[in-house]
Amino acid sequence: MITGLTLKNSIISGANNLSNRRAKVDELNVFPVPDGDTGTNMGMTIGAARTELLNLPDDCTVEKAAQVTASAMLRGARGNSGVISSLLFRGFSKALQGKKTADAKDLVQALEKGVEGAYKAVMKPTEGTMLTVARVASEEAAAWCAPPPSARWTTRPSSCRC
């Protein structure tokens, strides 16, 4: 079970990691304009959330941690990558409304909602961008959350000659 504190600390940790790798992410920035600022803009955007999350009490809910993150990121968004990041968290936050804690299924749904909102908000979504990274991450999370396929058939396949 994911508590508000766990989500809060995870987002803070992610913000710190992005800040530490800002220059590397800047180097990856080649589309739509190779201006080398994606890491900087994303770092500033999630950095705004980090600042507010540090002031959030440890007994916060996942709803509150997600809402504070989404709101701070929207207000602190810098550049296209910052705006898209804030949209991802906006959808993520909406999916966690009313939740004190979250399980894996809740987080998968939140990721999916974030991706859906970000794709809808971009006029011409282009694959090979941060949208793709978010979508694939969401799909992989869903795959890990799905029940494993059964090793036994409940009915014999028509191709089986047993």
Question: What kind of region is each of these model predictions?
Answer:
Residues 1-162:
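N-terminal loops that bind phosphate or other acidic moieties
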